[in-house]
C-alpha cells in the first residue's frame, strides 16, 4: 500500500507542475484573460486553441478525469482574480490513496500539506513548505 501511495503522490505532484507550466503559457497567450481554469487550459479533441479551451493540457486532466480524479487524487484550479490562481491536488481518500496534498500558486513552487487538506487559497498554499525535489 505504501508503494501505491508513493506512486500516486509522485503523479499528483507532477500534474501540479504540469498545471503551473500551462498557466504560464495561458497567461502569456491570453494576457487580457489572466490565468485559466482547468477547462480553459484543456479542450476537447480535435483541439483548436481558443480562450475557452487553449489545448495546453490533456482534456482528461482539464475535466478532472470526468470528475473522478486520477491516481487517487482530485485536481482543481481556483482563480482568485486575473493575477492569482491556486492549483491543487488532494487525495480522494486521505491515508489510502494519498497522504499529502499538493498545491501551487503563480510563483510556480509546488508545496505539500502532510495532512492531505485542500489548500485552495493563496494564503493557505503559500504558507506550506515547498516540495523538496
Question: Whereabouts are the PLM-identified features?
Answer:
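Short, charged, solvent-exposed linker or helix-capping segments at domain edges/interfaces
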Residues: 122-124
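Extracellular/periplasmic head regions of type IV pilus-like filament subunits
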Residues: 18-100, 104-109, 114, 127-133
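Amphipathic alpha-helical segments typified by the pilin-like N-terminal helix
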Residues: 1-25
